[in-house]
Amino acid sequence: MQATAQVQTPVVGRHVYGELYGVDESLLKDEERLRRIVIEAAHIANMHLVEVNSWKFKGGDKEGVSVIALVLESHIAIHTWPVYNFATVDVYTCGEHSDPMAAFRYIVSQLNPKRFTVNYSDRSYK
């Protein structure tokens, strides 16, 4: 009897996230537009959309919108604080053929911040 070697595929995890400053307040309140931006970002990044949920929060400095897309490869999230013209973006993928940086760049291009930060973390199993 011959033993067969099992080849394990490593977990490929890439996380791109950042903060966007100086974004137009009305855009940060527009739940439907933010949903469309996240959906298009998933397509651009070659991610497979499973579901998108969003919530609009009211109440002073806590007012804002959160959009979270569950993708087969992981998730995309935007959280906004319109009173501060501020948003955070989180794109995580464990898919070898998806491009989280492309999704992040698209979201930034659509939100058009005055400035932004971007961070990258390799979260792969090694």
From Swiss-Prot:
It comes from the Archaea. The record marks 73-74 as: Cleavage (non-hydrolytic). Keywords: Autocatalytic cleavage, Decarboxylase, Lyase, Polyamine biosynthesis, Pyruvate, Schiff base, Zymogen. GO terms for cellular component: cytosol. Gene3D superfamilies: S-adenosylmethionine decarboxylase (3.60.90.10). Its cofactor is pyruvate. Specifically catalyzes the decarboxylation of L-arginine to agmatine. Has no S-adenosylmethionine decarboxylase (AdoMetDC) activity. Heterooctamer of four alpha and four beta chains arranged as a tetramer of alpha/beta heterodimers. NCBIfam families: SAM_DCase_Bsu. This is Arginine decarboxylase proenzyme. It comes from Pyrobaculum calidifontis (strain DSM 21063 / JCM 11548 / VA1).
